Amino acid sequence: TREVMVLEFSSTVVALILAGKVGSNIASEIGTMRITEQIDALEIMGVNSASYLILPKIVATVIFFPLLTLFSIFVGIVGGYAIASLTGMMLPGDYIEGLFYCFEPFSITYALVKGAVFAFIITSISAYCGYYAKGNSLEVGRASTRAVVVSSITIMIFNLILTHIMRV
């Protein structure tokens, strides 16, 4: 269970949750700026709107999502310890021993890399959907929904690819 928590569950589930929350927020924020012509105003002033609006979001998520993945791993392991101890299914010493038995430190690196890749996917897809939104506020909602759906599917595909590439 440690392997599943560290290698697959934490990074993927955190990414899917954040695709829904962060992805929709980014797409709707940038889409609203496009609809209200704020992006056009930036371009008229000579500002590269894509790097000004999107790059800070990508950098922030690529740094922060792996930290959330670490937190998710920690909470999952502590939760497993609490349940095993409180229900009497396992002795606390056995649980701790099982955590360290055949532990590969690369597993943590693997989870952090996946978190960073998923962060880039979520942010770039959501920013793209918002940046190219056209029409009215209904289109912003559609762009936000499209960003979440495409990000979620892409995360699952890249999860498979990264698992095949990085699995030792």
Stretches found by the model and what they are:
Residues V62, P66, L70, F74, ...:
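Generic alpha-helical transmembrane segments of integral inner-membrane proteins
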Residues N48-T69, A143, A147:
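Start (N-cap) of specific transmembrane helices in multi-pass transporter permeases
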Residues L55-V59, V148-V168:
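Hydrophobic alpha-helical transmembrane segments of integral membrane proteins
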Residues I30-I54, S137-V140:
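Short cytoplasmic-facing helical segments at TM-TM junctions of multi-pass membrane proteins
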Residues T1-V6, F74-A116, S124-A143, I165-V168:
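Membrane-interfacial helix-loop-helix connectors in multipass membrane proteins
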Residues T1-D40, L68, I125:
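Hydrophobic alpha-helical transmembrane segments of multi-pass membrane transport proteins
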Residues S24, T32, D40-A41, A60, ...:
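Hydrophobic side chains within alpha-helical segments
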Residues L18-A19, Y110-A111, G115-F120, R146-S152, ...:
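Hydrophobic alpha-helical transmembrane segments that form the multi-pass transporter/flippase core
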